[in-house]
């Protein structure tokens, strides 16, 4: 019997096609979803309790002409960025209770696969099928200017995410690699590539995320059915769980990354792992092509050890009726999980 249970507490319907991505607002009081139906839906809850009913408070449409693949909140929670297969990114702002499109970012040659806002809200990163990573800077007058384009990947780029410091950008893609980008005062350059024959994932890397507590470990998931945990080569052999946030980052400098694969988690998934998210509780949730959701954690709650033993602590078989495309923990209530799927539904789960 699993030590924890993911209890279903809600199913949100309304999209007319597969739901690709979900994202919680920084305050955790709203959830954005995007779909093949070319819309974004904003979900709000009537009462501040996880089991209360969530409802669709806004529909953002008439912007993109093809599938919306990714959605990201600004750090303030007052703006959204949406990335589409129509090769554009839209920026929306909430004003007097109404969402308004205020900018459109054009430049990618074809499908944009992911969008991510940096921690101070000044930069937006995007990536796409054209093998590129773009970095955009917010300018006065609700304008955005492309300040750099990186062509380091040899194939489709699936995901981008920022380190919490904002000093490091991570991209991952169809070429089986993860690239770490840093800024030298003039441009962004590739500081490290994770992967390659025998040193990383053996197939497409679909998603990446940082450990929100130590901020020094990176997790990735792949078409090769595994998760990999990357940490600094200079990391200590163990860090007490009672240590202050960031203590485990000893030896890790975001502007000078030097990561290695410390743990490979295998045997838990039978099909592609499309998404993962690391909660402050230490649990990593995953969503896969077997329609399942898993929550994995290190077996020891006292030590964070490189190469430590990890286990599957909760599993929901057939959590959806089709591929689970995205899983995200709520930032304000770390036991509340959202998932979305090719079945067109968003589901909410409570970890017990």
Swiss-Prot record:
GO terms for biological process: iron-sulfur cluster assembly. GO terms for cellular component: cytosolic [4Fe-4S] assembly targeting complex. Keywords: Repeat, WD repeat. InterPro entries: CIAO1/Cia1, G-protein_beta_WD-40_rep, WD40/YVTN_repeat-like_dom_sf, WD40_repeat_CS, WD40_repeat_dom_sf, WD40_rpt. WD repeats lie at residues 14-53, 63-102, 107-146, 152-191, 200-240, 268-306, 319-352. Transmembrane segments: none annotated. Disulfide bonds: none annotated. The keyword Repeat applies. Coiled coil: none annotated. Essential component of the cytosolic iron-sulfur (Fe/S) protein assembly machinery. Required for the maturation of extramitochondrial Fe/S proteins. HAMAP family: ciao1. Belongs to the WD repeat CIA1 family. PANTHER family: CYTOSOLIC IRON-SULFUR PROTEIN ASSEMBLY PROTEIN CIAO1-RELATED, WD40 PROTEIN CIAO1. This is Probable cytosolic iron-sulfur protein assembly protein CIAO1 homolog. It comes from Chlamydomonas reinhardtii.
